[in-house]
């Protein structure tokens, strides 16, 4: 089912390279500045490819969208919906839900598929767990996804801050279901998992993002096997909590590679899967190599269920937290 795809990403000519900026604490680098020092350089896309009809989304403008944005500003919170330019922002915000991003909006990684800014983060806001809990109570949410930037500057990678947020939220909203979408805790897996197991979420999510062949280009600083091991070890420590992971398609992978990664996920006890289309945030990000047809996404879902995934969300506009409440309900019923 796979066409031949271009997988090599050319290196910028020395004369064309962006000058490497000095990164100061609290300064957010995006676009060309962000990816200036990654191993595989990005040539800015001159003409962005036209999106097929099945990718078109409604412009996220509505009173409910504005209300939630105002509430986030009031409590000095960040939503990954905005920071990562999610195509489902309008639908999710209009439905009165949001995925909250904790530990600031500056990431210590430089992944060139991602629209979140890079830099040296400021110290953690010790009031954030309480502010997040108050915002969730104000919104009267029943299902909440909490994610974060990577914080390689922290000894535990931010695991304790996740746990503090979970504790505060459950104090103010005892009935809420919580899903965490965590970083890879590079070099800190043991301590991070000990903390997480002591205050576990209702769903534990960590995205592999792409196939291992593309990690150097798409996830510099991350390791494919490390991420698989993180998910499996959590499952071994807290077996009653569903584990979840996801991939973006369109970065240059083949269908066969996607199937192989899905099989590896099942070998590492991952219960839930999300597959969605990669959309290039700007001309300075990794280019889209292909737009995967909805029929192919449907085929991946069929194959996933055959492998034993409890739930598979697979479609062009699917993102990790898209309809996460429905995904979790189905997966938990099957555990």
Curated annotation (Swiss-Prot):
- For whether the record's keyword set contains Protease, the answer is no
A single Gene Ontology MF term assigned here is: 4 iron, 4 sulfur cluster binding
Q: Which InterPro entries match?
A: Aldolase_TIM, Elp3/MiaA/NifB-like_rSAM, LIAS_N, Lipoyl_synth, rSAM
Give me the residues that bind [4Fe-4S] cluster 2, please.
107, 111, 114
List the GO cellular component terms.
cytoplasm
**Record's subcellular location:** Cytoplasm
UniProt catalytic activity? [[Fe-S] cluster scaffold protein carrying a second [4Fe-4S](2+) cluster] + N(6)-octanoyl-L-lysyl-[protein] + 2 oxidized [2Fe-2S]-[ferredoxin] + 2 S-adenosyl-L-methionine + 4 H(+) = [[Fe-S] cluster scaffold protein] + N(6)-[(R)-dihydrolipoyl]-L-lysyl-[protein] + 4 Fe(3+) + 2 hydrogen sulfide + 2 5'-deoxyadenosine + 2 L-methionine + 2 reduced [2Fe-2S]-[ferredoxin]
Pfam families in the record, alphabetically?
Answer: LIAS_N, Radical_SAM
Top EC group: transferase
What name goes with this protein? Lipoyl synthase
């Amino acid at each position: 089912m796979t066409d031949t795809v271009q997988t090599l990403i050319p290196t910028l000519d020395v004369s064309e390279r962006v000058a490497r900026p000095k990164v100061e604490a609290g300064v957010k680098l995006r676009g060309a500045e962000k990816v200036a020092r990654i191993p595989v350089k990005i040539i800015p896309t001159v003409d962005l490819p036209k999106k097929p009809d099945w990718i078109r989304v409604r412009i996220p403008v509505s009173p409910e969208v504005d209300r939630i944005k105002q509430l986030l500003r009031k409590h000095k919170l960040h939503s990954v919906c905005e920071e990562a330019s999610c195509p489902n922002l309008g639908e999710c915000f209009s439905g009165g839900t949001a995925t909250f991003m904790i530990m600031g909006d500056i990431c210590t990684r430089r992944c060139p598929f991602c629209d979140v800014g890079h830099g040296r983060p400021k110290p953690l806001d010790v009031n954030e767990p309480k502010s997040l809990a108050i915002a969730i109570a104000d919104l009267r949410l029943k299902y909440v996804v909490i994610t974060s930037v990577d914080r390689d500057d922290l000894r535990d990678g931010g695991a304790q801050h996740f746990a503090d947020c979970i504790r505060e939220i459950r104090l103010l909203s005892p009935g809420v279901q919580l899903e965490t979408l965590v970083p890879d805790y590079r070099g800190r897996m043991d301590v991070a998992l000990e903390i997480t197991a002591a205050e576990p979420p209702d769903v534990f999510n960590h995205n592999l993002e792409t196939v291992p062949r593309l990690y150097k280009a798409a996830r510099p600083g991350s390791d494919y096997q490390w991420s698989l091991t993180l998910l499996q070890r959590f499952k071994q420590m807290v077996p009653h909590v569903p584990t979840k992971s996801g991939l973006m398609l369109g970065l240059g992978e083949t269908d066969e590679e996607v199937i192989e990664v899905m099989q590896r996920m099942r070998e590492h006890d991952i219960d839930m899967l999300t597959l969605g289309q990669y959309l290039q945030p700007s001309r300075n990000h990794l280019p889209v190599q292909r737009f995967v047809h909805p029929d192919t996404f449907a085929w991946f879902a069929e194959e996933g269920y055959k492998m034993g995934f409890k739930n598979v969300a697979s479609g062009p506009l699917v993102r990790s937290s898209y309809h996460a409440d429905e995904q979790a309900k189905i997966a938990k019923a099957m555990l």
